[in-house]
């Protein structure tokens, strides 16, 4: 995939995303349904002087799950401790993290689906009853130690909700699905980021960047950064529609936000298989990508944009994809 359209965080994103991160719900653009629900749950918990139920945030990468976790902590007025599933390798690692929590704190675990099962099992009692029992030592000298924990809120984030075990999923009182962003929300995000970057962006340029951002704020901000570079070197520093079109064309991002591989998938299906249906494994072999990459990185956006659909027989290209790529659509195909 064209790196600029990769939804996973790149090294250059980390510092920028932190500086752009909204602090409270009234600064957070988009995800209105999720925000509305969480605002109610948080206000109710604060009125009862209770900790907020554990929250699961799930959805594609780049949609603001980490940002939402920090907003939740800020709205609660508590501290947040951040870690990631792969970093918690053994139960002792989890115990050390839990032991640092203060009453009411938020523990944010990104990629929670990647925690080892032995760690996950220790987390069950911590989430449900705020205690853990751990074994110290080994063999005849081993002993069980009971450790009470302060009440806390676990916020888990995952791009693979289906990989969570049923016992873990059941312990989240709140589950929030983060969806792809609408263009109008992405346009507002581009404008907000431009203000922070102190770069002038003309309205139609902000919309153009939004339209090509694959419904993902991370990509919108990354595109704005690159277009800003073109505007600085090839223009007068302002990001207008003309410089935006030129920059994104050079970056191989078309009007629908498709890159070379997206187009290759659709063209291969049209030219070799008359638009499908095609099995995902066969398709992956034909474009020299592994199946998981096609399923995780390309297919969701193509389906969301109406260029691809799943059937029992396999994947099929839609009439919209034919027209977008300049092919003549034959309904018999």
Swiss-Prot record:
It comes from the Bacteria. Its EC number is 3.6.4.-. It is found in: Cytoplasm. The keyword Cytoplasm applies. It is an enzyme of class 3 (hydrolase). Pfam families: AAA_lid_4, RuvB_C, RuvB_N. Mg(2+) binds at residue 66. Disulfide bonds: none annotated. It catalyses: ATP + H2O = ADP + phosphate + H(+). Residues 255-333 are annotated as: Head domain (RuvB-H). CDD domains: AAA (cd00009). Residues 182-252 are annotated as: Small ATPAse domain (RuvB-S). ATP binds at residues 20-21, 62, 65-67, 128-130, 171, 181, 218. DNA binds at residues 291, 310, 315. GO terms for biological process: DNA recombination; DNA repair. Belongs to the RuvB family. PANTHER family: HOLLIDAY JUNCTION BRANCH MIGRATION COMPLEX SUBUNIT RUVB (PTHR42848:SF1), PTHR42848. The RuvA-RuvB-RuvC complex processes Holliday junction (HJ) DNA during genetic recombination and DNA repair, while the RuvA-RuvB complex plays an important role in the rescue of blocked DNA replication forks via replication fork reversal (RFR). RuvA specifically binds to HJ cruciform DNA, conferring on it an open structure. The RuvB hexamer acts as an ATP-dependent pump, pulling dsDNA into and through the RuvAB complex. RuvB forms 2 homohexamers on either side of HJ DNA bound by 1 or 2 RuvA tetramers; 4 subunits per hexamer contact DNA at a time. Homohexamer. Forms an RuvA(8)-RuvB(12)-Holliday junction (HJ) complex. HJ DNA is sandwiched between 2 RuvA tetramers; dsDNA enters through RuvA and exits via RuvB. An RuvB hexamer assembles on each DNA strand where it exits the tetramer. Each RuvB hexamer is contacted by two RuvA subunits (via domain III) on 2 adjacent RuvB subunits; this complex drives branch migration. In the full resolvosome a probable DNA-RuvA(4)-RuvB(12)-RuvC(2) complex forms which resolves the HJ. HAMAP family: DNA_HJ_migration_RuvB (MF_00016). Has 3 domains, the large (RuvB-L) and small ATPase (RuvB-S) domains and the C-terminal head (RuvB-H) domain. The head domain binds DNA, while the ATPase domains jointly bind ATP, ADP or are empty depending on the state of the subunit in the translocation cycle. During a single DNA translocation step the structure of each domain remains the same, but their relative positions change. This is Holliday junction branch migration complex subunit RuvB. It comes from Lactococcus lactis subsp. lactis (strain IL1403) (Streptococcus lactis). The lineage of its organism: Bacteria, Bacillati, Bacillota, Bacilli, Lactobacillales.
């Amino acid at each position: 995939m064209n790196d600029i359209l990769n939804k996973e965080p790149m090294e250059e994103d980390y510092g920028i995303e932190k500086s752009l991160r909204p602090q409270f719900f009234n600064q957070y653009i988009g995800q209105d349904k999720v925000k509305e629900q969480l605002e109610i749950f948080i206000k109710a918990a604060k009125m009862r002087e209770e900790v907020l139920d554990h929250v699961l945030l799930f959805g594609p990468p780049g949609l603001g799950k980490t940002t939402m976790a920090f907003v939740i902590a800020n709205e609660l007025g508590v501290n947040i401790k951040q870690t990631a599933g792969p970093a918690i390798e053994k139960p002792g690692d989890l115990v050390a993290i839990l032991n640092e929590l203060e009453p009411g704190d938020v523990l944010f675990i990104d990629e929670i689906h990647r925690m080892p099962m032995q760690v996950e099992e220790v987390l069950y009692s911590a989430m449900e009853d705020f205690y853990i029992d751990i074994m110290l030592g080994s063999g005849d000298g081993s002993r069980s130690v009971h450790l009470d924990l302060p009440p806390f809120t676990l916020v888990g984030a995952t791009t693979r909700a289906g990989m969570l075990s049923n016992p873990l999923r059941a312990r989240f009182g709140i589950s929030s699905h983060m969806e792809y962003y609408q263009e109008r929300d992405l346009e507002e995000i581009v404008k907000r980021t431009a203000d922070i970057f102190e770069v002038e962006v003309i309205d139609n340029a902000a919309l153009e960047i939004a339209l090509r951002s694959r419904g993902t704020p991370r990509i919108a901000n990354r595109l704005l950064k690159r277009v800003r570079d073109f505007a600085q070197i090839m223009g007068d520093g302002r990001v207008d529609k003309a410089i935006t079109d030129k920059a994104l064309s050079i970056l191989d991002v078309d009007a629908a936000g498709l890159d070379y591989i997206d187009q290759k998938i659709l063209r291969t299906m049209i030219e070799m298989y008359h638009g499908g249906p095609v099995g995902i494994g066969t398709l992956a072999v034909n474009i020299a990508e592994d199946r998981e990459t096609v399923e995780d990185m390309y297919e969701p956006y193509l389906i969301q944009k109406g260029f691809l659909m799943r059937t029992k027989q396999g994947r099929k290209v839609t009439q919209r994809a034919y027209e977008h790529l300049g092919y003549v659509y034959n309904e018999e195909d």
